[in-house]
Amino acid sequence: MKIQCDVCEKAPATVICCADEAALCPQCDIEIHAANKLASKHQRLHLNSLSTKFPRCDICQEKAAFIFCVEDRALLCRDCDESIHVANSRSANHQRFLATGIKVALTSTICSKEIEKNQPEPSNNQQKANQIPAKSTSQQQQQPSSATPLPWAVDDFFHFSDIESTDKKGQLDLGAGELDWFSDMGFFGDQINDKALPAAEVPELSVSHLGHVHSYKPMKSNVSHKKPRFETRYDDDDEEHFIVPDLG
């Protein structure tokens, strides 16, 4: 006995989908579950067909049984099923299933092989493109994080030292030219002698010169720095105001 596909209703079903609750043939299974990633994660169980010979009926032991009763836990043929479950209303409520002789696989399988066959293999150019970022990341890890100092000076490379030296010479020449008109006017003529003392030196005085120098003594001021005292004088008339009268 075979189960018909619930989608095309033509080919025999080989897979039962637990999420869709449908029996599917191989072609319909690929078309439905390869549509998107969510459908590809559905749990499917394979249907393994047993031998074409059905077991015998547990009641008559003569005819092939294809009905299973859950409450009676027995395989029944069509005649025995009618005689038992149609007799009264209580037995008519028993749960009975069709025993097709097909066994469901214990482990869930996903039709990954069929999907991989339909997908094209990546070309060599794509494989090379995937390998290039891995190499670039490894090169970045090998590079040191801190910048290494340069073996040559920046000033020597750009010749800043030569520029500074020429600027200093130009400034000195320009300064000397500006001071020429001071010498022409006689500012630096006789006023500055060769024997003039530097500004930082203090002239030394001989003992004879010290005699003429009058010693300076600070004059004492007659004004005293003491605080003035205020004296209070009481007259004889004022003493009467401080006498307490005797009331006794």
UniProtKB/Swiss-Prot annotation:
Residues at which Zn(2+) 2 binds: 57, 60, 80, 85
Region of interest called Interaction with COP1, as start-end residue ranges on this chain: 236-248
GO biological process: photoperiodism, flowering; positive regulation of shade avoidance; response to light stimulus; seedling development; vegetative to reproductive phase transition of meristem
Recorded GO CC terms: nucleus
Tissue expression from the record: High expression in leaves and lower in roots and flowers.
Segments of skewed composition (Polar residues): 120-130
Outcome when changing residue 226 to N: Prevents nuclear import
Localization of this protein: Nucleus
Keywords: Metal-binding, Nucleus, Repeat, Repressor, Transcription, Transcription regulation, Ubl conjugation, Zinc, Zinc-finger
Chain residues that bind Zn(2+) 1: 5, 8, 28, 33
Keyword Ubl conjugation listed: yes
Job description of the protein: Acts as a negative regulator of seedling photomorphogenesis and light-regulated inhibition of hypocotyl elongation. BBX24/STO and BBX25/STH function as transcriptional corepressors of HY5 activity, leading to the down-regulation of BBX22 expression. BBX24/STO acts additively with BBX25/STH during de-etiolation and the hypocotyl shade avoidance response. Functions as a negative regulator of photomorphogenic UV-B responses by interacting with both COP1 and HY5. May act as a transcription factor in the salt-stress response.
Additional notes on this entry: BBX24/STO expression is not changed in plants treated with increasing salt concentrations.
Name the record gives this protein: B-box zinc finger protein 24
Species of provenance: Arabidopsis thaliana
